[in-house]
Regions:
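Catalytic core of non-heme Fe(II) oxygenases with the double-stranded beta-helix
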Residues: 79-207
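Non-heme Fe(II)/2-oxoglutarate
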Residues: 1-84, 109-113, 119, 128-132
């Protein structure tokens, strides 16, 4: 069974080169139809061997999940707002590589990634087997996700934060995508000082 959460510090051998490359990518304009705050790069950041490195760490061969923004970067400033909140990811496993400057990571209010419990149901993740699903009283996962996650995503009073993984330059956070999570608020006033991350959405490698 995959670990629900793993933190790997000092992940890249040259994180400053990755950061420069991430900032050099083209980014979509804020509010261009997505639900998240901030803006995503229009192409992936090229980091040689990242899929293989994560595969070795968890002991399962992984590839980028089709239909996701695997490898793309996200830039979020303090002023950016989004429509969605707590969510799950459409992937086998998820990851976030933090690329904000060290001095910005330690400023008050500079958050990493938050994990939540749904107050009404007591759930911290989507059930992973039939027995767990039956215990929730829901007949299928679609109904559960629709009425727990999608319905309450933007209602903070429905959720209790159970953990915040602090942001740290060159920290890789790996986690089960079925845990209820959300990015902590953005920060900074420009790309240099903002919240900069590389998004990773993994699928099992074919073959």
């Amino acid at each position: 069974m995959l670990p629900s959460l793993t933190i790997i510090d000092d992940f890249l051998s040259d994180p400053w080169a990755a950061r420069r490359a991430a900032l050099a990518l083209r980014y979509a304009l804020p509010g261009t139809g997505r639900n998240y705050p901030g803006r995503d790069s229009t192409s992936a950041l090229e980091v040689d061997g990242i899929n293989a490195a994560v595969s070795r760490h968890i002991g399962i061969d992984l590839a980028g999940a089709e239909g996701t923004e695997h490898g793309h970067c996200r830039l979020t400033l303090k002023s950016d707002k989004g429509r969605s909140g707590v969510h799950v990811d459409p992937a086998f496993y998820s990851g976030i590589l933090y690329l904000s400057r060290p001095e910005d990571c330690v400023k008050p209010g500079a958050g990493g990634t938050d994990f939540f419990r749904h107050k009404r149901t007591g759930l911290e993740r989507v059930p992973t087997n039939g027995a767990e699903l039956a215990a929730t009283g829901y007949d299928n996962l679609d109904d559960l996700v629709g009425t727990v996650v999608n319905k309450d995503t933007t209602q903070p009073s429905k959720w209790e934060r159970v953990m915040r993984v602090p942001i740290r330059f060159n920290r890789l956070l790996l986690f089960s995508p079925w845990q209820f999570h959300n990015s902590a608020p953005g920060f900074g006033t420009d790309p240099e000082s903002g919240r900069l991350v590389m998004l990773l959405f993994f699928a099992k490698a074919k073959g």
